[in-house]
């Protein structure tokens, strides 16, 4: 049998997640402003290599995407974790 989860714990958890998401969105917006300013300066130089700022931003963005995907998987998994998995030998 699955365990019963407290509704209060879920609301606290969701509140914490919303706060974290808002903080990340604010940081993301600040990074975009810095990136646009850096790109304007770099366009004057016309260098062929990627700027370290751009590479760092891409790395952080990819980590953020993976973190969101894992969080989404965990939320879906927690919704359905109390439903038992039934294996069937029938084809």
Curated annotation (Swiss-Prot):
Residues with lipid group (N-myristoyl glycine): 2
Post-translational modification: May be palmitoylated at Cys-3.
GO molecular function: protein kinase A regulatory subunit binding
Localization terms from the record: Cell membrane
Cross-referenced Pfam families: SmAKAP (PF15127)
Keywords from the named record: Cell membrane, Lipoprotein, Membrane, Myristate, Palmitate
GO CC list: plasma membrane
Role played: Binds to type I regulatory subunits of protein kinase A and may anchor/target them to the plasma membrane.
Family the entry assigns: Belongs to the small membrane AKAP family.
Protein name (Swiss-Prot/TrEMBL): Small membrane A-kinase anchor protein
Species in which this protein is naturally found: Xenopus laevis (African clawed frog)
